[in-house]
């Protein structure tokens, strides 16, 4: 292969693997269990988080535990982790500590998940399909470290790696947004209804991401 064609091939591969794009109406599909398949979400977050709200849609027929959103920093695993323990049980980890919220839900079925946390009060709250669950207290006064590695599809036990097949996600994830504030109920309901506010940490309509392994982008057909 001559040099111009080689560089075009390399550039095309980089653009495919490292993209910044509007994913409206689309999802990441994770078709299999693995220790390799994942998506890295890139954000220029330079300051520790004192508050946040994270919302996304997911669809899986797994009955075992799995990671939905894994945020690690240097030397700190489970700095921020959204984890499904089993059907009807969702956990939020902040700084390796966790709370779990329970909800009656159909299985298997698509779900819209929002979770918020506020450092000053320590209050963490899940919203499932537009309905708030019982508030819990978690790590009052703590700050979530900046410069994270954020992974979909796997649970990190190190900074960007050390994955476990038994915690991998199989299914679809889309409409993911993250803000550096606790959204009021009306804005969470707007996200559930498909009209979210512009997000300043992660925004599905302007997402910087990197696909690793067998992950496919497909149309969202289950909302």
From Swiss-Prot:
| Example GO molecular function | calcium ion binding
Disulfide bond entries: 55-114
- GO terms under biological process: acute-phase response; chaperone-mediated protein complex assembly; host-mediated suppression of symbiont invasion; innate immune response; negative regulation by host of viral glycoprotein metabolic process; negative regulation of acute inflammatory response; negative regulation of glycoprotein metabolic process; negative regulation of monocyte differentiation
Could you say which residues form the signal peptide?
Answer: 1-19
Cofactor entry: Ca(2+)
Expressing tissues? Found in serum and urine.
This protein's major location comes to secreted
**Which purpose does this protein serve, as stated in its record?**
Can interact with DNA and histones and may scavenge nuclear material released from damaged circulating cells. May also function as a calcium-dependent lectin.
Task: Please identify the protein, giving its name as recorded.
Answer: Serum amyloid P-component
Q: What organism, scientifically named, is this protein from?
A: Homo sapiens
Name the gene that codes for it. Answer: APCS
């Amino acid at each position: 292969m001559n040099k111009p064609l080689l560089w075009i091939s390399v550039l095309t591969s980089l653009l495919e693997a490292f993209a910044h794009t509007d994913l409206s109406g689309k999802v990441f599909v994770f078709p299999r269990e693995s220790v390799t398949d994942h998506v890295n979400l890139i954000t220029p977050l330079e300051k520790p988080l004192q508050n946040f709200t994270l919302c996304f849609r997911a669809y899986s027929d797994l009955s075992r535990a799995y990671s939905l959103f894994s945020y690690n920093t240097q030397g700190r695993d489970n700095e921020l982790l959204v984890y499904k323990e089993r059907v009807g049980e969702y956990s939020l980890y902040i700084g390796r500590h966790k709370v779990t919220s329970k909800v009656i839900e159909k299985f298997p079925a698509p779900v819209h998940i929002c979770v918020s946390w506020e450092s000053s009060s320590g209050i963490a709250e899940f919203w499932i399909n537009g309905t708030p669950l019982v508030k819990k207290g978690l790590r009052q006064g703590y700050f979530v470290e900046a410069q994270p590695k954020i992974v979909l599809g796997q649970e990190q036990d190190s900074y960007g790696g050390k994955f476990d097949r038994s915690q991998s996600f199989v299914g679809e994830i889309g409409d993911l947004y993250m803000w550096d504030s606790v959204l009021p109920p009306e804005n969470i309901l707007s996200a559930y209804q498909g009209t979210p506010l512009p997000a300043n940490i992660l925004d599905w309509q302007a997402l910087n991401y990197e696909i690793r392994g067998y992950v496919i982008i497909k149309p969202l057909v289950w909302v």
